Amino acid sequence: MQRKLVVLFCLVLLAFAGLSVRLILINRDNGDSYKKQVLSQQQYSSTTIPYKRGEILDSKGTKLASSEKVYDLVLDIKQMNNKEDYVEPTIQALEDYFSIDGDQVRAYAQEHPDSQYYVLKKRMSYNEISDYQQMMADTSQKEYNQYVKGIWFEESYKRVYPNSSLASDVIGFTRTDGTGTYGLEEYYNDVLSGVNGRQYGYIDGDDNLQRTTEAAVDGYNVYSTIDATIQGIVEKYLKKYNDENKDSTREGNGAQDAACIVMDVHSGEVLAMASYPTFDLNDTRNPEALIGSKLIDVSGNSTDTVINEEIAASMKQEENNDLLVQNLNALWKNYCINSTYEPGSTMKPFVAAMGLEDGRLKGDESFECTGIIEIGGYKIRCHNYTNGAEGWLTIGESIERSCNVTLIRIAQVIGIDEFLKYMSEYNFGLKTNIDLAGEARTASLVFNSSTMGPTELATSSFGQGFNVTMIQMITGFCSLINGGYYYEPHMVSKITAADGSVVKNIEPRLLKQTISAETSEKIREYCVQVVEGANGTGKRAKPAGYRIGGKTGTAETVSASGTREKEDYVVSFLGYAPAEDPQIAIYVVLNRPNAREQDLETRKACIIAKNILTEVLPYLNIFMTQELTDEERAELEAMQIEIREQLSANAPASDVSGNDVSGNTTDTGGDPSAGDTTAGENSSAAQPAGDDPSTTGGDTANGAEADNPYVNSDGQLIDPTTGEVITEDSDGYDVPVSGILENGAAGDSGGDTQNPME
């Protein structure tokens, strides 16, 4: 028996020896290959580390667009199934902390037992995952959490817009892939975009498995020239106009488009740019924003049907997606740069400047208004024709009264060649190259030497027959009143890195001088007559206590069939302030206002400008130079009451616009409903740390709160000269803050209705 055991032991020993020899031989011949294979099997797949898209801020640092870290909830079913003891505790954790349907998880796990990437919930905020994170880190719950396996989070970024609809036309938004579309998001997409990082493993020269990480490079931040407070003021009054005029003479919005630009006349910086209707940047695909607009069919043609709640609701159905997209594309466009129209009588100061600069006019000439003038077989009326001929008018009086006949005579003195030369000098027919996506081309929409004859020259003198964009008009107008200096309009003042260091300062770019300082001075005088003259068409644009200049405009529109509309107009006011030392220009346009009396609507364009300037000028520390009339003082007192009511209703003192400038943040939790609005901006398979890695959204450095001299830190209305709190018994103060009444001086002549050719 003992011998048998010895023999068996020897045989086993020989077998082990033989196996060892075999292993040595295999290792000698194929060891490197097998070792690399084993090491390669040990390394993890390459992981992408997402970059953070740069922020868009206003000129004072208010966040207009930012990116927040979000988390996708992922379940590794294979890991959960490693032990039977893991399954139910893991599913229970999903139910308790994330409200996941446990039965749904069980069913999926049964069908896909080897799945390692089951996405249960997308784009959760850190707050939504923090309770689970704390539970897993809590050692006192070890008896429970040690059985929770396979739950992990994939990081990405979501684009958020803290002020929702504020400056939506200017900002634009991002698609689901993180690329910008429309506005600054599109134009500066390459600047705002960063470079994804990577975490990966490799085998080094010593056959060791190494891990390395290439950090993500975040995008640059873009500082806009937009002032959020001024932007909010502009948007408030555009909305107020719509609210007061929608459904007035026909169903629909107060105007097809209502828009405004405020620009620094000495730099081309855009301080505010807005149009109505607007949309929520956090919910760009919401069809409710279309209510009140005319329906655009699936072929892209405008119809007479007005979108109501029922039509908007039907657009949410999948079969109507093409219809929704057509109408949203129209909504997302920026009227101030994307749309063209005939400028009407706001063109008249440009024409006067042509003749003065060319030397064919001295400034002391008079021209006769005969009420009607015949050009090329067409009879063209003066807008005031119903009251008879205006008689002999100076150039200034022609601008003040907005007389078409005398402007035609001035254009005839200038001549076709010089007229076309200055049209190009003012940049009509050329893009301004503003740094926003989608500026319209107008080269084919203006006359040239082959297409302009006597009739075209005549109609061009009062702004009909050719098309412009709002940005062309206000940029050219700034050169008329700032001494002749034409600055390229721009929306961004600087670009910074994620650490705050300045990458690039964008300085004003002077392109040319359109007219001399002497001509510019005369044009300013003429524009002041429009507002202050006895027969001025722009008297309702005058803010209390200030002198300003400007020009009203009314132009007939052209229907889809090419005929002149007799009831639909474009009315506008183009002005500057203050008259003594121009600092800002303002341009208000109402496209096809919801009214029949176009003179009245020109007044309303003036009133919008007046209300905006009443708030903006004191905000910019531009003080009154005129004593208030009793009527003006009454208006300002009514405004003070309105502000007190807003304050008593707990309205944020800094929210002068009625928009979300006050720092109200959007709800960033959960899966957003914005469709293409927010972007995943790439993702990273990473388990977040216990601390909140980023808190980027929601804080808005309110320019109004920091700079408004009329509200103290407690939100109380104060006298800016004494600092005393104004009560119901106070006498008030002279400088307006917000929202004066719209009743201007009685007896205003209103706007100038553009005349059709008979």
Predicted regions and their residues:
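Periplasmic/cell-envelope proteins involved in peptidoglycan metabolism and beta-lactam response
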Residues: 1-311, 340, 417-425, 543, ...
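Beta-lactam-recognizing serine transpeptidase/beta-lactamase-like catalytic domain environment
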Residues: 65, 71, 203-215, 258, ...
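Short coil/loop linkers at secondary-structure junctions
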Residues: 99-101, 361-362, 429, 623, ...
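Short, highly charged C-terminal tails/helix-capping segments
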Residues: 624-648
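Short helix-loop capping/hinge segments that flank enzyme active sites or metal/cofactor-binding pockets
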Residues: 686, 703-704
